[in-house]
């Protein structure tokens, strides 16, 4: 254990997240995902179950209805699967949205 006496102010601990809208980043990922999944050839039982887990806050675009950040958690916990689909489809817009969300928020 370190005996250092570094004081970290609470308002400084998450400075790197300042001005980043992780809810909106997650919404953009889901926007792209739902657009891609409209094509029947791109969907399967996994994605059908995934869609059921999308919280109401996404559909209302109201982050206040998502205080536990369920949407961000859903996106971040499935990053590999989402990115695999986006890359398989070769959708640059979707890949960019997922990359941004992953880098800034996950």
Swiss-Prot record:
It comes from the Bacteria. GO terms for biological process: nitrogen fixation. The keyword Nucleotide-binding does not apply. Pfam families: CowN. Keywords: Nitrogen fixation. Belongs to the CowN family. NCBIfam families: N2Fix_CO_CowN. Is required to sustain N(2)-dependent growth in the presence of low levels of carbon monoxide (CO). Probably acts by protecting the N(2) fixation ability of the nitrogenase complex, which is inactivated in the presence of CO. This is N(2)-fixation sustaining protein CowN. It comes from Denitrovibrio acetiphilus (strain DSM 12809 / NBRC 114555 / N2460). The lineage of its organism: Bacteria, Pseudomonadati, Deferribacterota, Deferribacteres, Deferribacterales. The gene is cowN.
